[in-house]
Amino acid sequence: MEPEISDTKVTARFTTRDENLHLPDQDRTLLISTNLKRVNLSKILNELLGREDDRIPFDILINGQFLRTTVDEYLTKNGINAETRLEVEYTRALVPPLNVTSFEHDDWVSAVDVLSQTSRAGAWSGGSVQSGQERILSASYDGLVRVWNTSGDVLATSEAPNNGGRITSLKSAKWLSDKKIVAAGMDNTVRVFKYDEDTRTITTSLELFSHRWGVEDVAVHGPSSRILSASSDNTISLFSSNAKENPVAPSSLLPNSTAASNKRQKLSKPDRTVPARGALTTFTGHSSPVSSVIFKPDDATVAYSASHDHTLKTWDLPTAQCVDTRTTGHSLLSLCAIPSRNLIATGTSARHITLIDPRVSATQISVMTLRGHKNGVVSLDTDPSSDHGLVSGSHDGTVQIWDLRNVTTGGQVGEGQQGESVHTIHRQGQSGPGKGHGEGVKVFGVRWDKDVGIVSGGEDKKIQINRALGS
């Protein structure tokens, strides 16, 4: 005997944040069957909007959560009485992003960044970036930074650094403005480069010394000319991109300072012409390598750092004090701020993303846990067009897209709400489900730009751009 199907109806008020998709006033409150699912409600909305011949797939949210079942199942699971009027929001469903193009490198691509009208560096540059003139920055394990156009042409490549024969692999690179680039890596040095669009050159303008081991990450703030670096030596350093504002560099950290073994390099290269400076401040407190560092989006006097010691720390930069420490259960590999929710997203070695409320008043460490990756999550960025979107890059060879409203049940005690990804992007040319959790296709860096799309780089020696059709 088949189970009885409920014919209960419930009152629902439909709203949207898209000004072009508002329903007529008389159609905003409807009596709907609780048997309906998302696809049924999407069809009804298209009919009410007069879009039968040009349908838009809609996602449906009830009380801020995606509807993934029937309305009846949602009401039962959340303990909502059918007599309650539901507040239903409809929004364009996120279309799976398609591969637009890929750019080949000679070595692994460790980091990517985008300069566009809508990027932070574009905004810091006073609107000088024109539509159609977007630039992509890449850092590679060959020790070089490159600037590309969106057609895949290399516009400029930096010269190999004069670093005394140290390992030159880069780990991080950021646009500071349309004319300045900051990059750092395994030779312990943070470099500021001048990018000249007219001559298509990238030249080193400043070298910054503070770390004794490799630099894992850099963060930049254009308006204040400040740079943060996170290092494997367990420290964080603060610099200025203006040479005169920094102190003299420690002589013990300079390459070719006294080493006789580098005599041949000294003879073959001119004396140092690039200014060398030290740090304004060095922050200690982590007990293991610091993997990531960011400025607080609305207050550049505050920074957050993530470490293999399982902690997220909040720093007051003017006083060089750690003002808060949040301890998790796993090594933290990446960071991203979500200002609209007052949360910090942290990628972990345990394959998930933990959303942490860093405010001192917060009583719960993990507000939400996002699961879906099969290896460490090493790069994060937010959706530039939404307060709810997040993108992650992992050593499992995938980039995953998340919507924080996509909440599921279950999970372990203390992990808060659970979320799962809405789309997965594989490396272009990767056949089948993938090579053993990212073998040969690890993703090292990802950026989400409103104009360019989702840009990622990795072990396959490629920059890959994905974008939703029509965006």
From Swiss-Prot:
GO terms under biological process: chromosome organization; maturation of 5.8S rRNA from tricistronic rRNA transcript (SSU-rRNA, 5.8S rRNA, LSU-rRNA); maturation of LSU-rRNA from tricistronic rRNA transcript (SSU-rRNA, 5.8S rRNA, LSU-rRNA); protein-RNA complex remodeling; ribosomal large subunit biogenesis
Keyword rRNA processing: yes
Keyword Repeat: yes
Disordered as annotated region, ranges: 245-274, 412-440
WD repeats mapped onto the chain: 119-158, 165-203, 210-249, 285-325, 327-366, 372-412, 436-471
Keyword annotations of the record: Nucleus, Repeat, Ribosome biogenesis, rRNA processing, WD repeat
Region (Ubiquitin-like (UBL) domain): 10-92
An example molecular function term from Gene Ontology annotations: ribonucleoprotein complex binding
Gene3D superfamilies per the UniProt record, alphabetical: YVTN repeat-like/Quinoprotein amine dehydrogenase
Family the entry assigns: Belongs to the WD repeat WDR12/YTM1 family.
Record's subunit section: Component of the NOP7 complex, composed of ERB1, NOP7 and YTM1. The complex is held together by ERB1, which interacts with NOP7 via its N-terminal domain and with YTM1 via a high-affinity interaction between the seven-bladed beta-propeller domains of the 2 proteins. The NOP7 complex associates with the 66S pre-ribosome. Interacts (via UBL domain) with MDN1 (via VWFA/MIDAS domain).
Described function: Component of the NOP7 complex, which is required for maturation of the 25S and 5.8S ribosomal RNAs and formation of the 60S ribosome.
Protein name (Swiss-Prot/TrEMBL): Ribosome biogenesis protein YTM1
